[in-house]
Amino acid sequence: MYKLQLLSCIALTLALVANSAPTLSSTKDTKKQLEPLLLDLQFLLKEVNNYENLKLSRMLTFKFYMPKKATELKHLQCLMEELKPLEEVLNLAQSKNSHLTNIKDSMNNINLTVSELKGSETGFTCEYDDETVTVVEFLNKWITFCQSIYSTMT
């Protein structure tokens, strides 16, 4: 009687692993990777909000694209595609500021973390929303995305 249950359990486990269902260790790893990504995005938002009014108003003229529906880690591809424009906007505003190194470090961290989190899937293409967002909205939405993913893993 127990053999049948054990065999069913083994078969189910193999089916889940074969279909790349997240395992407990991969969930823990993902959570560990999401934490620094979230912190880096929050740091950038803090830096943006610390600019003088003139610089912030200039930064708000640049527009960014958000995916129509970001609910899975694969949607981080959309963030990755907008990292270069984000870095250019932050560099423009930081031209004479000492925080430039910290921003570059955060951007590099975000790039590496997003690459690891989204995995090797290359066939995914982003479907962007028709409306663009400001740099503040962009960072806030990605922070919310990370928090949402993180909360589903706890």
Curated annotation (Swiss-Prot):
Molecular function, one GO term: cytokine activity
SMART domains, per database record: IL2
InterPro entries per record: 4_helix_cytokine-like_core, IL-2, IL-2_CS
Record SUPFAM superfamilies: 4-helical cytokines
Database matches in PROSITE patterns: INTERLEUKIN_2
Any single Pfam family the record assigns to this protein: IL2
Disulfide bonds: C78-C126
Glycosylation sites: T23
Leader sequence segment: 1-20
Location(s) in or outside the cell: Secreted
GO cellular component entries: extracellular space
Keywords: Adaptive immunity, Cytokine, Disulfide bond, Glycoprotein, Growth factor, Immunity, Secreted, Signal
GO biological process: adaptive immune response
KW Signal (keyword) present: yes
Task of the protein: Cytokine produced by activated CD4-positive helper T-cells and to a lesser extend activated CD8-positive T-cells and natural killer (NK) cells that plays pivotal roles in the immune response and tolerance. Binds to a receptor complex composed of either the high-affinity trimeric IL-2R (IL2RA/CD25, IL2RB/CD122 and IL2RG/CD132) or the low-affinity dimeric IL-2R (IL2RB and IL2RG). Interaction with the receptor leads to oligomerization and conformation changes in the IL-2R subunits resulting in downstream signaling starting with phosphorylation of JAK1 and JAK3.
Protein family per UniProt: Belongs to the IL-2 family.
Protein name (record): Interleukin-2
Protein source organism: Lama glama (Llama)
Upper lineage: Eukaryota, Metazoa, Chordata, Craniata, Vertebrata
